[in-house]
Amino acid sequence: MLMPKKTKYSKMMKGRNRGYAVRGIKLNFGDYGIKAVEAGRINSNQIEAARIAMTRYVNREAKVWINVFPDKPLTKKPLQTRMGKGKTGVEEWVMNIKPGRIIFELTGVNEDVARRALELSMHKLPFKTKIVTRESENEIY
């Protein structure tokens, strides 16, 4: 499970997820990647499920890079609890994803295999995504 080893503060405000991504919008390592088309939140279980789906299809022949890390704590009150009484403990760790952010990168296999592996992992993510290549990465979201 992905989570930070240590944080300065244990809890964080919810915040807003507006605008487009500024960082992480180009392929750095791989030849193919998954780019977010809409905003959302991704947790460590979803990242791991997408990674497993991808690596199983390519039989561990390809090199996979994960470009996101869940570093924001998400708290949740138990069911049938009255309001007040403070903020509860951390339920899970998430990362806000903005449109245009590259989530996974892949290299080491041909294009057909890479596209199929990325499609399988796209189904595990909770927001719309698209496949980008080195040639198509400059397209608008």
Swiss-Prot record:
Database matches in InterPro entries: Ribosomal_uL16, Ribosomal_uL16_bact-type, Ribosomal_uL16_dom, Ribosomal_uL16_sf
Domain of life: Bacteria
Transmembrane stretches, start-end: none
Biological processes annotated in GO: translation
GO molecular function: rRNA binding; structural constituent of ribosome; tRNA binding
Gene Ontology CC: one annotated term: cytosolic large ribosomal subunit
Pfam families linked to this entry: Ribosomal_L16 (PF00252)
Family: Belongs to the universal ribosomal protein uL16 family.
Role this protein plays: Binds 23S rRNA and is also seen to make contacts with the A and possibly P site tRNAs.
Quaternary organization: Part of the 50S ribosomal subunit.
Protein name: Large ribosomal subunit protein uL16
Organism: Campylobacter hominis (strain ATCC BAA-381 / DSM 21671 / CCUG 45161 / LMG 19568 / NCTC 13146 / CH001A)
Gene from which the chain derives: rplP
